[in-house]
Amino acid sequence: MRAMVYRGPYKVRVEDKDVPAVEHPNDAIVRVTLAAICGSDLHLYHGLMPDTRIGHTFGHEFIGVVEQVGSSVQNLQVGDRVMVPFNISCGSCWFCARGLSSNCHNVNPNATAVGGIYGYSHTTGGYDGGQSQYVRVPFADVGPVRIPDWMHDEDAVLLTDAAATGYFGAQLGDIVEGDTVVVLGAGPVGLIAAQSSWLMGAGRVIVVDHLQERLAKARSMAYAETLDYDEHDDVVVELKKQTDFLGADVVIDARAPERYRGEREPVDPRAGHVPTRVSGIRPW
């Protein structure tokens, strides 16, 4: 099969690799029909992710068709069209039982702080990813979800990571009816977080960025108010002005991690919780 393979920092190429096989009775083999490139894949490409080994296949956002199932798999059948979440989890350990599946104890032999992730180095288990023609899916009864016939592939693939991350960020904010929500960053995850905030009852949603194209999408796609931080000396002060000097009830930070170190947050002191850091692995 063909796969996108890591060959060192700033070096990736499409190569021939063996088609993966069932290694455990709970495995499934999925033929990939669509894969996406995540912004975090750049961390691998730039050589910033520890223990990214030569020959590793990238890709943690993919959908496909089940080609083979192990003898213990009960919920999937050959021919099922499925979306596969980016993280791998057993569904039964202490963490999984408490909804913390990205910290699963049974899927990563190389670390204890994080569970398994497809195509994201041996630090997260060394599982080859979905930027390939086929992928082995462990614990196939736990992660994959059948895609309804009416859903297009281009929509379904967003559910593997980007859409789920934005929604989860809003969910972690414990938004209540009428809350003012500020979303920092108007990229895809930020836009989905803004849309999700409305679904959870927000009374106002304000998106902060400086790229005009993204701010325009925040207005047209997420129906949010927008703030261009290039136009203000102090964004926190400006946000407080726009909220009767109370600040936001919830802040969802959808920027790259290096962007928010040591910064003040425009949070209402009544809020009772810290800002939500949008991350599939480490909610703040």
Which sequence ranges carry the predicted segments?
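Adenosine-nucleotide cofactor-binding segment
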Residues: 180-186, 198-281
